[in-house]
């Protein structure tokens, strides 16, 4: 049997969601038990020996990855959700999209001051959602000690944005272009 890399499990869909876009579909990675296991192990590898209090995942595919990572680390999991999806008391951060604005929220008691958080998502593009998630965590007094992604789209500048914030960024693979 050949050794497949995480990248080999990711399907590319042309012209989705708009013409000219190459959509990197990680659902094929999630559907394959071996590929999913490899991805979780590789997401955790750079953090061996580090202590985390919680893992935060960005909606929606970050929930799948973040939940699995939190399980492996024996930590809690914090969902960072889109506006209108969390009941109860929340804090929010807005961020700019190409055309407009979006909001992410987290429960106001999800993270305690001083907790060490690993932020996880499937894909790093412009970094806007990840930056908003980091700001939410910091607003609650948490410390983001790592940002882990399956896919980095370096041409869109997200890694540079997060590194400029002082974040350690780990991605399993990169795809050039849009």
Swiss-Prot record:
Its main location: cytoplasm. Its EC number is 2.4.2.7. GO terms for biological process: adenine salvage; AMP salvage; purine ribonucleoside salvage. PROSITE patterns: PUR_PYR_PR_TRANSFER. It is found in: Cytoplasm. Pathway: Purine metabolism; AMP biosynthesis via salvage pathway; AMP from adenine: step 1/1. It holds the Pfam family Pribosyltran. GO terms for molecular function: adenine binding; adenine phosphoribosyltransferase activity; AMP binding. The keyword Transcription does not apply. It catalyses: AMP + diphosphate = 5-phospho-alpha-D-ribose 1-diphosphate + adenine. Keywords: Cytoplasm, Glycosyltransferase, Purine salvage, Transferase. HAMAP family: Aden_phosphoribosyltr. Catalyzes a salvage reaction resulting in the formation of AMP, that is energically less costly than de novo synthesis. This is Adenine phosphoribosyltransferase. The gene is apt.
